[in-house]
Amino acid sequence: MKRFAALLVGVLIFAATAASAQDRYQSSPERRVVAEKDWGPWLGPFRAQLVPSLMRDFGERYLYAPANTALPAPRPGEQRVVFLGDSITDLWELARFFPGKPYVNRGIGSQVTAQMLLRFHQDVVALKPSAVVILAGVNDVHGFLQQETAAQIEANYEAMADIADRHHIRVVFGSILPVNNYTDNAKSMLEDRHPEELRAINRWLAAFCRERGYQYADYYSALVDDHRLLQRDLTTDGIHPLATGYARMAPIAAAAIARALRSHPRA
């Protein structure tokens, strides 16, 4: 009984000490508790499966780690280009649309700019490219994995560009693509991905590229319709381009890459 009482006193002292320590944290008041949103029959289970993994590796750096290790250094004179992005990049068949080019795909579906920033050193810098093509932001606006304001998205763009500059890697930013809600698969697409917000971020990104001397690949203008939405025949789900969409994007990317490679990298 005495042993139990001593143990109970010890627990109470520990709890009181922990509570007192908590009061001293600069981050007080306590962290917020967020109610989970109903993400629907497909995104809900996907998110439930994904979030525990992200708690261990938010940037998902493990996904390309084996491929990065196996990839040899660029040959003398080779101008390697890394495409960094989300599912729109992940689904882009670079060998098909850029035959013979030493282009490396490092897209990961559903990712946001904060995740790409976390893996930038591993998936871009370590591969020693001459240039990087960054296509990101549409998932940030959606808020599926990370709630980001436009200013926070822009800060992530800038941070990735700063890292590239530090390592003498030329930078190409792709505009966020338009989206649409024309089909049943896309009927809720505009609820969280507001077209006017996408356009505002693109305007900022284009101005940022002009200011820094980066190349801006304007996919948006090549894919948008008269309603300022993604052209109906270029997608089935309102967000991911079909091969016909990538066929329009490829020459825009190629021209931006060519301009970037002719320029001097920022120091």
Please place each PLM-identified region on the residue numbering.
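Pocket-edge structural micro-motifs
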Residues: 85-86, 243
